[in-house]
Regions:
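Catalytic phosphate/metal-binding cores of nucleic-acid and nucleotide-processing enzymes, i.e., regions
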Residues: 127, 175, 188, 355-358, ...
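Basic, amphipathic N-terminal segments that precede the first structured/catalytic domain
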Residues: 2-140, 333, 345, 349, ...
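Conserved beta-sheet core of the metallophosphoesterase superfamily
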Residues: 215-246, 254-362
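Conserved protein kinase catalytic core
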Residues: 109, 158, 207, 268, ...
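Core catalytic region of metal-dependent phosphoesterases/phosphodiesterases
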Residues: 54, 83-104, 112-229
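A short, hydrophobic/aromatic-rich structural module that often spans a beta strand
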Residues: 198-205, 357-365
Length: 384
């Protein structure tokens, strides 16, 4: 008993009592490592953000470069304006026709029970439109046709990881569109003098951001198509490309001022929105007599404005996703010294219509409307 007590006493004497002010070296090392890891993570996050910003700009620049290269290669394969024999320009007429051309979405493919659309059907529908314009021209004694191009001639796939890989497809789709529109212009030129104006749409922009400045808004496939047609028809008698603007454009026909918009800047109250926009010009002393726009893919012609439908008609997204059905149609307006008569030309049924010839090997599509039906789901997400 006494021996055990003596051992416990010796053990207590051997114990070292640490003063609270003396720091544990292991704990200090651990804290230093944690601070170092946090600093490294902060630097890694900064580098990741900087690399992402550079990567996005580099992808866009590489995609545009590849697109231009492919486009030049395709242009070298065709003779755009050789061998043209144009009829003489009509010397007089009592009317001018305005063809409201918008939302053509050439590279969209639709295969529904109620509607089909591809490049061939687009060529048929434009051929049908030209025949209706010619009929109206004969009835009203028109000498000139003004084509107002209101944008969204192509669907653009703006996902950065697909921009470069789809450069060939987009260049081919651009030239398919040019080929069909070239035939459309030449068809009308058989009977009329032609003037063409153009603006950009929202769906055919190259960048994913919707821009309102001229620099951003003009980065569009609509401008590319317009410029190719303009250069291809340079020097052609009776075909004049008069002007292109990013968002809004004015032109005059028989003393009337027309305003061109795409339509994505117009709100739910169409009449109010149109009057607000024309009010800007009234403040500058410019009276707008009629406003032309599209965007919504549904025809609506009023006293002071006309909304165009699309050349496509209903697609998978509009029918299944929005429960919204529409027909393929474009507007034509007959302008005389005292009147502006507008009408919708129904282009849905093209049975028996011969399509314009185009290079079928250039067909390339963007299945954008069907992809809108698939809602992405995030399996695992880290938010910083």
């Amino acid at each position: 008993m006494g021996l055990n007590k003596e051992r416990r006493t010796r053990n207590r004497k051997r114990q070292v009592v640490k003063h609270p002010c003396v720091q544990d070296p292991d704990r200090e090392l651990l804290q230093f490592n944690v601070r170092l890891a946090k600093a490294r993570q902060a630097q890694a996050d900064t580098n990741r953000i900087e690399r992402k910003a550079f990567r996005e700009h580099a992808r866009v620049e590489n995609a545009v470069t590849a697109y231009a290269r492919e486009l030049c290669a395709r242009l070298e394969e065709q003779s755009f304006s050789r061998g043209l024999t144009l009829r003489s320009i009509p010397e007089s007429g009592d009317a001018v026709l305005i063809v409201q051309l918008s939302d053509l979405h050439f590279n969209e493919r639709v295969d529904l029970p109620s509607n089909r659309y591809d490049f061939s059907i687009a060529a048929q529908r434009l051929a049908k439109l030209a025949s209706r314009v010619k009929q109206l021209g004969k009835s009203y004694g028109a000498r000139k046709v003004v084509i107002a191009c209101l944008g969204d001639f192509l669907n653009s796939d703006r996902r950065l990881d697909e921009l470069l890989s789809n450069a060939t497809n987009r260049s081919k789709a651009t030239l398919c569109a040019v080929d069909i529109l070239r035939a459309f212009v030449l068809d009308l030129r058989e009977q009329f003098e032609i003037e063409v104006y153009g603006i950009t749409g929202n769906e055919s922009r190259v960048n994913k951001e919707l821009g309102w400045s001229d620099e951003l808004a003009s980065d569009s496939y609509d401008l590319m198509i317009y410029e190719i047609l303009k250069r291809g028809f340079a020097g052609a008698d009776g075909i004049a490309f008069k002007g292109f603007r990013s968002n809004e454009l004015l032109f005059e026909v028989m003393g009337r001022t027309f305003l061109c918009l795409h339509g994505h800047q117009i709100g739910a109250n169409v009449q109010k929105s149109v009057q607000e926009i024309t009010g800007k010009y009234a403040a500058r002393g410019i009276t707008v007599d009629f406003t032309l726009f599209g965007h919504l893919h549904a025809s609506a012609i009023g006293d002071y404005h006309a909304r165009n439908a699309s050349l496509v008609g209903s697609n998978a997204y509009s029918e299944a996703g929005l429960n919204f059905c529409s027909k393929a149609a474009q507007n034509v307006h007959v302008v005389t010294p005292g009147t502006i008569d507008g009408m919708k030309v129904d282009l849905q049924d093209v049975s028996g219509i011969e399509p314009y010839p185009f290079a079928a090997e250039w067909e390339a599509y963007c299945p954008k409307s069907e992809r809108k039906l698939h809602t992405p789901s995030v399996v695992y997400q880290v938010v910083v």
